[in-house]
From Swiss-Prot:
Gene3D superfamilies: Nucleoside phosphorylase domain. Keywords: Cytoplasm, Glycosyltransferase, Transferase. InterPro entries: Nucleoside_phosphorylase_CS, Nucleoside_phosphorylase_d, Nucleoside_phosphorylase_sf, Uridine_phosphorylase. Its EC number is 2.4.2.3. GO terms for cellular component: cytosol. One of its GO terms (molecular function) is uridine phosphorylase activity. The lineage of its organism: Bacteria, Pseudomonadati, Pseudomonadota, Gammaproteobacteria, Enterobacterales. It is found in: Cytoplasm. The gene is udp. It comes from Salmonella typhimurium (strain LT2 / SGSC1412 / ATCC 700720). Belongs to the PNP/UDP phosphorylase family. It catalyses: uridine + phosphate = alpha-D-ribose 1-phosphate + uracil. This is Uridine phosphorylase. Pathway: Pyrimidine metabolism; UMP biosynthesis via salvage pathway; uracil from uridine (phosphorylase route): step 1/1. It holds the Pfam family PNP_UDP_1. It is an enzyme of class 2 (transferase).
Amino acid sequence: MSKSDVFHLGLTKNDLQGAQLAIVPGDPERVEKIAALMDKPVKLASHREFTSWRAELDGKAVIVCSTGIGGPSTSIAVEELAQLGIRTFLRIGTTGAIQPHINVGDVLVTTASVRLDGASLHFAPMEFPAVADFACTTALVEAAKSIGATTHVGVTASSDTFYPGQERYDTYSGRVVRRFKGSMEEWQAMGVMNYEMESATLLTMCASQGLRAGMVAGVIVNRTQQEIPNAETMKQTESHAVKIVVEAARRLL
């Protein structure tokens, strides 16, 4: 294995070339697509779920690095990128909305997350809020408006699990533990916009350590209507979200 300054990512400080902002999708296959929208994209490393590229915006280096699914792997990516000099993190993902008025194809910008994860507890007690940085949130909202995307801003429920933690019954056992039975209805009543699996860890880590973080997601399904997304809709929604996160990064540099 090549020399690295960190345990998992396979990167050195020299690889970052002074970058202080990272775009962090979950999916490794999304990394190259994001980097391709910027100047001078170059692949840096790929190890397990962590694929990283470097590119430039207005002459400044930006890192794009996948986190994999869920809080534990996200915490590794964020920790090691911070060790290498990253101070601002913009997460991009896809999501399932749980409010009837949110349509497939809309964009959601997260201001804070319901901490349904476990990893964030390793960084701050449950009383500490998983809150996004104001400048990051503002940049994401402005970027979304600049491309004409229908945008909703609010709270996200961030779960360690895709099935029981998001109250899905289409599973092998068909069972959801008592803690999560009826939970989606409660989150809906509180105005929570959506479910995803990484933002609670990301936002808690960053807010508690003096780092900046923001979160944007494209809606690929509304769970009040259906559970399975359409492939073409997913592709279009991802494309919009990618453009938004790159424009937001430009505004934050």
